[in-house]
Amino acid sequence: MSTNLRKTHPLAKIINNSFIDLPSPSNISAWWNFGSLLGACLILQTITGIFLAMHYSPDISLAFSSVAHITRDVQYGWLIRNMHANGASLFFMCIYLHIGRGLYYGSYLYKETWNTGTTLLLLTMATAFVGYVLPWGQMSFWGATVITNLLSAVPYIGNTLVQWIWGGFSVDNATLTRFFAFHFLLPFTIMGLTMVHLLFLHETGSNNPTGLNSNADKIPFHPYFSYKDLLGLILMLALLLTLTLFSPNLLGDPDNFTPANPLSTPPHIKPEWYFLFAYAILRSIPNKLGGVLALMLSILVLFLMPILHTSKQRTTQFRPLTQILFWSLIANLLVLTWIGGQPVENPFITIGQMASILHFSILLILMPIAGMIENKMLT
């Protein structure tokens, strides 16, 4: 009897066990689609990025005009550039939905998968930040200046650290060159860590909406979830192309159409929409070091989620108290995102401070307490 090459060949066997014969819970909903969508985003961003790198010049005298050259003179350069810029926005939409799913359904109890995922988020944020500097527009330059300057809040070594990252006494040619190097390198690091993320996931298998063990009811990944993922991919690409072809600059900043000028500060310095919530938390604390710590903690708090889980049940599906807190957290993050894009004046300052306090209160205090109360209600 001839054996199936798919199951015996050393390389094909890995692919088979990961994407074809993988036993999957039969009841995972569309919320489980975002992992594969993130993989698709990563591939798309890498391909468009490599094509952009072929025509881009990482030099302060050429960067801005090389991006203009790409959009005007390169065959389909406008499409590649706009897909790359809007692909980043879609990437973060998928990341946030993926994390939200993990929080809601208690996926963070797979600690290794969760920790590699949170590290992937940090790497992706770093990649997006250095990438935003590359077109060398006003917001690129001042964004780089403001965010790298935050490191000067580090006691004793702060200023040295900032100058070391800048490669001089201000954001200059050395900074742009190294940011381009990092922007090219980091996605490959992300790919490697994505494989580790999947490796850890396949050690335990996927979680499911009930949070119960699903070993008794598994179905093969292909054809069921491969086609389901394909549908998700088609919908995501439709959204990306709609955004790219009809309103490519909707999510961008008009200031970035002005070449970088160290002598003129834009009226409102703000990052891309996907960083606004963290930027709002940073700005809500009057002390520089305090702001930086709050900014870092707002992301690093994700590492604490497995420790903060107090409930006997895994998912939020059957826990009304935690559900109210979860959706309050989402609403609060939307408020923070809105505040991050507003000028630093009242009432925005006060709203930002209240939303920042609420953000940490829900995650660190209220959710663990709600879990304990629900446990009491069960007994």
UniProtKB/Swiss-Prot annotation:
List of residues binding a ubiquinone: 202
Entry coiled-coil feature ranges: none
Residues binding heme b b562: 84, 183
Residue spans crossing the bilayer: 34-54, 78-99, 114-134, 179-199, 227-247, 289-309, 321-341, 348-368
GO MF terms, alphabetically ordered: metal ion binding; ubiquinol-cytochrome-c reductase activity
Membrane topology (UniProt): Multi-pass membrane protein
Cofactor comment text: Binds 2 heme b groups non-covalently.
Claim: Protein biosynthesis is one of the keywords in the record: no
Primary site of residence: mitochondrion
Location in or out of the cell: Mitochondrion inner membrane
Residues that, per the record, bind heme b b566: 98, 197
A GO biological process held by the record: mitochondrial electron transport, ubiquinol to cytochrome c
Co-factor requirement: heme b
Presence of the UniProt keyword DNA-binding in the record: no
Key words, A-Z: Electron transport, Heme, Iron, Membrane, Metal-binding, Mitochondrion, Mitochondrion inner membrane, Respiratory chain, Transmembrane, Transmembrane helix, Transport, Ubiquinone
Gene3D superfamilies hit by this protein: Cytochrome Bc1 Complex, Chain C (1.20.810.10)
GO cellular component, one term: respiratory chain complex III
Subunit structure: The cytochrome bc1 complex contains 3 respiratory subunits (MT-CYB, CYC1 and UQCRFS1), 2 core proteins (UQCRC1 and UQCRC2) and probably 6 low-molecular weight proteins.
Biological role: Component of the ubiquinol-cytochrome c reductase complex (complex III or cytochrome b-c1 complex) that is part of the mitochondrial respiratory chain. The b-c1 complex mediates electron transfer from ubiquinol to cytochrome c. Contributes to the generation of a proton gradient across the mitochondrial membrane that is then used for ATP synthesis.
Remarks, miscellaneous: Heme 1 (or BL or b562) is low-potential and absorbs at about 562 nm, and heme 2 (or BH or b566) is high-potential and absorbs at about 566 nm.
Family in the record: Belongs to the cytochrome b family.
Protein's recorded name: Cytochrome b
Organism: Actinemys marmorata (Western pond turtle)
The organism's taxonomic lineage, starting at the top: Eukaryota, Metazoa, Chordata, Craniata, Vertebrata
